[in-house]
Amino acid sequence: MSYSAPSQITQRQLAYFEGKHVLIAGELIDDFPFELAKHCESTSIFTTNYSYYKQFAEHDSIHCYFGSELTETTNADMILLYWPKAKAEAEYLLTMLLAKLGKSTEIVVVGENRSGVKSIEKMFADFGPINKFDSARRCSFYWGQCTEEAPTFNQQDWFKEYQVEFENHTIEVRSLPGVFSHGEFDKGSELLLQTLPALRGHVLDFGCGAGVIGSVMKTINPKIHLDMVDISALAIASSIETLKANNLEGCVFASDVYSDTKENYQFIVSNPPFHAGLKTHYSSTEELLEKAPQNLTHEGQLILVANSFLQYPPIIEKAFGECLTLAKNNKFKIYSAQK
């Protein structure tokens, strides 16, 4: 089994976990929890990633929680935090989990050095001591313990609020840390919205993030039936809050590409992700494009924005027979295809 670099450095330090009830959280991407479970009293996972949750949900040996906040009761006395790409998300997870588990909780933090994992030294200072105990494969391994009472966690305090102006409409956006375009209006999304035709029927917003695209589409096309999906529980929570803030209706839910969606969409609209953690990752978008025809109605349309360097047109052409470029600027292109 090939593990990620953070898991490999953790594997070197299994003695830290002996006799512990370990709760794993953060940017975990491999099957290392199964290995860890052999060396500790119990292992559970809290993940905001729906795809990762689905991988572990079927295994009885490891309990897996999915959501934007851990609300279930757990007997964990140690956190293993895989440092996420966004520092703000790390702080969110750390604060939320320590508030849940309480004083005396031990913590191990692992991550690639380029991800900014060193920030844990300052971030954890108010909770207790933490020190680096290992470095390998350009990763660091920290161990610490919460010796102070953690403050009460209220998720509402973590939403960043900002406004998006589009065609004389003002959209109130509420976004949690770790969500794409957190706190700002992404230029690719703006070009996509400027290019969209009038929408009708059942519309899917794939990779909804904080809900900007879906909210604008619903504001301009109030009669559409809107589904908004994302793999991230933080995005789902953000989109729900954004719709609520604008008195809009839509169905927001987690889906690993089309795993939980309906079929027969008139439009699939997306600013799809192409990063997973610190690495460029295209597989979910490729699946989005390849399977789009079978999820569209007759003459249904796929419209997406992408960075100009991404080679999506050949995939779209293979799936649909043709790929049109509706608009472009020096960074983004808008692609479209019709069933």
UniProtKB/Swiss-Prot annotation:
Predominant subcellular localization, coarse grouping: cytoplasm
Keywords on record: Cytoplasm, Methyltransferase, rRNA processing, S-adenosyl-L-methionine, Transferase
Q: Per the UniProt record, which EC number(s) apply here?
A: 2.1.1.172
Q: Does the keyword Cytoplasm apply?
A: yes
Q: Which residues form the signal peptide?
A: none
Which locations, inside or outside the cell, does it occupy? Cytoplasm
- Example of a GO MF term: nucleic acid binding
Keyword rRNA processing present in the record's keywords: the answer is yes
Please give an example of a GO cellular component term from this record. Answer: cytoplasm
Task: Read off the CDD domains from this record.
Answer: AdoMet_MTases (cd02440)
What reactions does this protein catalyze? guanosine(1207) in 16S rRNA + S-adenosyl-L-methionine = N(2)-methylguanosine(1207) in 16S rRNA + S-adenosyl-L-homocysteine + H(+)
Q: Which family does it belong to?
A: Belongs to the methyltransferase superfamily. RsmC family.
**Listed HAMAP family:** 16SrRNA_methyltr_C (MF_01862)
Q: What is known about its subunit structure?
A: Monomer.
Its biological purpose is as follows:
Specifically methylates the guanine in position 1207 of 16S rRNA in the 30S particle.
What protein is this chain from? Ribosomal RNA small subunit methyltransferase C
Q: From what organism does this protein derive?
A: Aliivibrio fischeri (strain MJ11) (Vibrio fischeri)
Gene behind this protein: rsmC
